[in-house]
Amino acid sequence: MKRSAFFISDGTGITAETLGQSLLAQFENITFNKFTRPYIDSVEKARAMVQQINNAADKDDVRPIIFDTIVNQDIREILATSNGFMIDIFSTFLAPLEQELSSHSSYSVGKSHSIGHNSNYMERIEAVNFALDNDDGARTHYYDKADIILVGVSRCGKTPTCLYMAMQFGIRAANYPLTEDDMERLQLPAALKEHRSKLFGLTIDPDRLTAIRHERKPNSRYSSYAQCEFEVREVESLFRRENIPNINSTHFSVEEISAKVLVEKGVERRFK
């Protein structure tokens, strides 16, 4: 079964998309065609959006799901005329919260991410820069400044996890790819030994690793199942031998991996 889903906002659309994606993920038997539409901030744009929604309804022969964080009442009313099932995120959650707090909300779109009022902005940028500078074992002499160091075979999800932790939580995360040479030495690389307390391992199912590597280097030794199976087996053995906490990333999203890593290592988020 297929359904169209729209994430609509008069701001960046991050809130609508994040919450909407999380909710839709609970319905694994349905395939969603997803469309993010930020900055729908005028009557003209709203009317054009209604046409897009109605076109999707006609094409799918079923009304689309709409997640919106629209602040402007006039624009919301226009969207409500579409042939879609609307979930107004702000009104759904803010109304009961206003009642509980005995206070009216400001209904300010994008407030939680405002640069001008967010003292965490520079820390977020510094964390992202750290993740980029210390990606893939490129530099190891700043590991003393890292909050956490992810280790694992190439293409197991280390880089996106580091960037997510940096962007969302201000975590200074480095990552180091364990190579065939490291595995043959049967011990941690020298650059990692003195930072053992910061290490966390990612592993992955060999068949999934094969598929990922095949997209990068098809029909190569690097992407062969035999090579992937060997590397995964050896790196998991290294994790056990060195007592490095680890998780299998195969069936988890970047968000889930990040949360599990922080909990396992007891690393506090710099901001929430």
Curated annotation (Swiss-Prot):
EC numbers: 2.7.11.33, 2.7.4.28
Entry superkingdom: Bacteria
One matching Pfam family: Kinase-PPPase
Residues binding ADP: G152, V153, S154, R155, C156, G157, K158, T159
Transferase as UniProt keyword: yes
InterPro entries from the UniProt entry: Kinase-pyrophosphorylase, PSRP
One example GO MF annotation: ADP binding
Enzyme class: transferase
Keyword Transferase: yes
Catalytic activity as recorded in UniProt: [pyruvate, water dikinase] + ADP = [pyruvate, water dikinase]-phosphate + AMP + H(+); [pyruvate, water dikinase]-phosphate + phosphate + H(+) = [pyruvate, water dikinase] + diphosphate
UniProt keyword list: Kinase, Nucleotide-binding, Serine/threonine-protein kinase, Transferase
HAMAP family per the UniProt record, alphabetical: PSRP (MF_01062)
Family label: Belongs to the pyruvate, phosphate/water dikinase regulatory protein family. PSRP subfamily.
Main function: Bifunctional serine/threonine kinase and phosphorylase involved in the regulation of the phosphoenolpyruvate synthase (PEPS) by catalyzing its phosphorylation/dephosphorylation.
PANTHER family to which the protein is assigned, alphabetical: PYRUVATE, PHOSPHATE DIKINASE REGULATORY PROTEIN 1, CHLOROPLASTIC
NCBIfam families: PRK05339.1
Protein's UniProt name: Putative phosphoenolpyruvate synthase regulatory protein
